[in-house]
């Protein structure tokens, strides 16, 4: 009866927004079911080898299709790709990010152009471009690569819990 348990987070991360301009703010969240792994796992499983072996972009995109569902217009299964069929603009964005990955990889903010930092943060450009693309095709976006100013929940259980429940800045 004397125990009080408090659970909270120190910050919210990512700033998830529902609705995206290129989908007219509609959502297609089932697209996200095609993502089979995190960007970090994709980096360690695939991208590190692409860099080492100088893998051609089209070959890398076969792994992107298998792990994220994003499909090139030239793919034999393009007619079945639905909302995950890439536009020419998206292909060029992915190609640019891929070439930057092979040439430079990730970098600190001080060593990047403002444009590259806004596009990729300090992460591997190709993986970030993949994630941005599937997010945007799904109708979601993230406002930051880091902490946000959003308030966090505080959960409480036990003696005096009613004094601690809520959302706090």
Tell me what each language-model feature is.
Residues 1-169:
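A post-motif C-terminal structural segment
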């Amino acid at each position: 009866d004397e125990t009080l348990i408090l659970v909270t987070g120190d910050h919210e991360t990512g700033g998830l927004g529902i609705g995206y301009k290129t989908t007219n703010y509609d959502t297609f969240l089932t697209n996200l079911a095609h993502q089979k792994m995190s960007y970090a796992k994709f980096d360690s499983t695939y991208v590190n080898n692409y860099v080492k072996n100088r893998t051609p972009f089209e070959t890398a995109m076969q792994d992107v299709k298998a792990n994220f569902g994003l499909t090139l217009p030239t793919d034999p299964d393009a007619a079945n790709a639905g909302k995950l069929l890439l536009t020419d603009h998206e292909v060029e964005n992915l190609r640019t990010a891929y070439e930057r990955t092979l040439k430079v990889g990730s970098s600190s903010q001080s060593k990047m152009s403002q444009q590259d930092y806004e596009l990729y943060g300090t992460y591997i450009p190709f993986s970030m471009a993949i994630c941005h693309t599937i997010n945007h095709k799904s109708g979601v976006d993230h406002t930051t690569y880091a902490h946000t100013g959003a308030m966090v929940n505080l959960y409480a259980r036990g003696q005096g819990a009613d004094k601690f429940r809520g959302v706090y800045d």
